[in-house]
Amino acid sequence: MYNNYVDLAPVNANWNEDILIRMPSGGWQQAWFRCYSPKPSQVVNLSRAITSVMQDKFNPTAGGPDVQTAVDPWSRVDYDERIPGAGTMLSDYYSYGQLLLEQQQIWNGPVYSECGNNYYYSGLTTGSGGCDHGYDFDKKPWLVDFYLRKMQPLSCNWSLGYGDRSEKDCDRFFAKTIAFGMPCGFLGGWRLNLDYLMIRGYYMLQQLQSNYCNAFIKDIRYANAKGELLDVSKAISTGAYKRSQIRLEYDNGLVIWINGNNEENWKIPKANLPPTGYYARMPDGTLEEFSAINNGERIDYVSSPDYDYIDGRGNWFEAPKGATDGQLIILKNKDGSREIIPNGSKKIAIALEQKPEAIIALDKDRKEIGQSAVEPRGGYFYIQPVPGAFSYLLKFR
């Protein structure tokens, strides 16, 4: 549930000149356009009054106090001499912290704020947007230790980007989100139609983030020009961290290699990573995924308990679980059946231990529109397309 205790407009029913932050000059603290900032000492009372109305009307289970973690603690200091702690950052920091903690109790669920200065509030809120307005992640080195070791155990911030729309920008958006151990924001948001970039973003990140967001970082290494993996102290002293080629190991065994370099490929034991490429694997093999070079072309692949994802990016790509020249999603249903969803694919094939008993073509409303057939060839079962089919449900004996 959206709520805001940083921007108060004169048309608000709670407007009162005496609850506004006073500057050293005695003037009101300006906030967003046509708005002024309420006193930090008053925001908890405002929250309690407003959230009780929200609960009665909507009964939400999560909150979004906007702007709260976008501003640094010293930019909303109240200099009103009538207020205890006037002119100190501690008074507003304490009040904002109490607000964020209380909201989690009120909603009995997560509370996420905006972004920009969220590191000051780690542990006080469930999380915030991951953007740091003062740092250019697309051009500057990725130094991930502070976030992964200090912030991530306290708060789960999300998404290092704004929904970039080119393929190159999206690749970098995904890679930096993985490098900093964040869940990925839904690319493009609700404003845009579902397209191949959104599909790629969801399937490349969903299973991977389910593993690293539920674990703590164990080891961080940065590669130098020789491929040697250095700890952060040696990486900084030698300048190797500027290459942004990072190996992460989490305490659940997950290992991730991310090439944040803008120009150079990075050959690792299991893959050849292009700029913004990555490789991840759980030690038991339940999850393996990569965005890497295959036969000179970049491809994307996920093998996981819930689904397999194969993306040839317009080129024919033969993966362990299937093959396609577009995007291919293989959903693994609990009853043992498989739903095959192609997108932009001229040919699709899947690797199966046995031939399906039935292949049912479904439309977008999941209505049956016919039967398909498979042709075994080259270690795969090639699915014969059915006009108008959105997906194919494979059933086995």
What are the roles of these predicted feature ranges?
Residues 2-18:
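Active-site cradle of extracellular carbohydrate-active enzymes
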Residues 13-354:
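Active-site-proximal substrate-binding groove within the catalytic cores of carbohydrate-active enzymes
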Residues 244-246, 255, 379-381, 390-392:
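Short beta-strand micro-motifs in enzyme catalytic cores
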Residues 250, 343, 376, 385-387:
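Surface-exposed coil/turn segments at beta-strand junctions on protein surfaces, enriched
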Residues 290, 360-380:
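Solvent-exposed beta-strand/loop surfaces of large extracellular or lumenal domains
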Residues 347-352, 380-386:
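Exposed aromatic-hydrophobic patches
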Residues 387-397:
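Surface-exposed interaction regions enriched in Ser/Thr/Asp/Glu
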